[in-house]
């Protein structure tokens, strides 16, 4: 395309990161806000102009002129590791400073996933994020289905394909909740 940020190598590299603890501790803006001066852009789950549903952020390089492909990859990898370190520190802070609030949040998410009858896509992404945080912090028991698989398979297109008919409104939200209830009945130890 004719976008000025594509001048140079034209290499666009991005990574998706799940940052629920940074969001819960109100540190996400501070951490991600420091990326623009480094030539990195932060977007939501669906790219430019989108929100970060499910606490998932896309981080990508903006500058391709005057940087080698190797430098671009090395820079993004180093920054990603720092962001992950910040997320892990925030999780530790939640464990030590707000254990009951954290436990309540993740257990409420699990209860909703196991029992809800209607779930919007936005609510699903939010509670799946909380549930994953609970599993990774070893507060909640693991489930057999993976986080990304659950996110993708709870989207409208996948639900319509599985049900072999168009879905919208409450019927779509019902089928999404039904799918997730079934997935959460399959627990792994």
Task: Enumerate the predicted regions with their spans.
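Conserved phosphate/anionic-ligand binding catalytic regions in large, soluble enzymes, centered on
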Residues: 1-17
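Long, Pro/Ser/Thr-rich low-complexity/intrinsically disordered regulatory tracts in eukaryotic proteins
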Residues: 11, 23-25, 30-189
């Amino acid at each position: 395309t004719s976008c000025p940020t594509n001048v140079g190598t034209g290499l666009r590299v991005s990574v998706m990161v799940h940052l629920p603890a940074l969001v819960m501790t109100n540190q996400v803006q501070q951490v991600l806000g420091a990326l623009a001066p480094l030539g990195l852009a932060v977007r939501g789950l669906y790219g430019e102009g989108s929100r970060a549903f499910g606490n998932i952020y896309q981080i990508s390089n903006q500058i391709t002129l005057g940087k080698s492909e190797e430098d671009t990859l090395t820079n993004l990898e180093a920054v990603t590791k720092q962001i992950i370190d910040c997320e892990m520190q925030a999780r530790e802070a939640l464990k030590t400073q707000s254990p009951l609030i954290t436990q309540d949040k993740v257990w409420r998410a699990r209860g909703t996933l196991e029992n809800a009858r209607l779930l919007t896509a936005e609510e699903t992404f939010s509670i799946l994020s909380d549930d994953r945080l609970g599993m990774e912090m070893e507060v909640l028991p693991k489930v057999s289905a993976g986080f990304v698989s659950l996110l993708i398979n709870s989207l409208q297109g996948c639900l319509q394909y599985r049900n072999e008919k168009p879905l919208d409104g409450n019927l779509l939200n019902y089928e999404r909740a039904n799918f997730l209830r079934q997935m959460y009945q399959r627990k792994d130890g």
